Amino acid sequence: VPKSRRDVHKNLYSEDALGNGETFIKYIQENAKDYYSAIDFAKGYKIKALTKNTKGDLVDVKMDGQDNSRGNTIFSVLPEDKNLIMNQFEIVKSLEQNFEYPKGDEVVLFTAKNNEIDKNVLKALGYSENDKVKYEDVLGKEFSIVDNNNYYTKVENRFVPATVDEKMYNAGTKVKIVAIAKAKDSFTAPQFTLGYTKKLQDSLLSKEVSSDIVKEQEKDKS
């Protein structure tokens, strides 16, 4: 790829894009406050997760036909400013009383106003699309978020997903659903199903940065 084309894909948001030692993100935060009431920046990190279905079998948490080597679209990191989310959703059930927002390794399940979850998402969470799932069935459900070194195996010069087994599950970071939030109105559609904390994301990224697949990518800048 010609150098000029590679430069188009550089991360200009966290680099000195303005030429004065200031990143674009920092500039927006400090100089454009009059133009937004709240703002959040996403890293685009997609997690790889396993769970157990109703039969007790381990399954990859992914939509039918989704290539999980590209990451998971069911999980999404939540903004640190809870108002960005909770202005649109309300907690309808939680493991703890007076729950407001997830902390640490806690996960929240988001639904439409009528408590509906897409059947493909339901299957990805380990349930049959015909199951009638109650709040009590979902609360406390555990997932194992697997890091690169445990999820991928190297075959010749390529990294491919390894076989899902108990060893992979046990090696992952365990999280569980602690609350269910539904949309306050019928016009709000959840953009994701499971929301997790930025603190958890930062912890996961601190491991991934030194993983074998990332090291290989760093060596191959072409």
Model regions and ranges:
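Basic-flanked hydrophobic alpha-helices used for secretion and membrane insertion
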Residues: 1-222
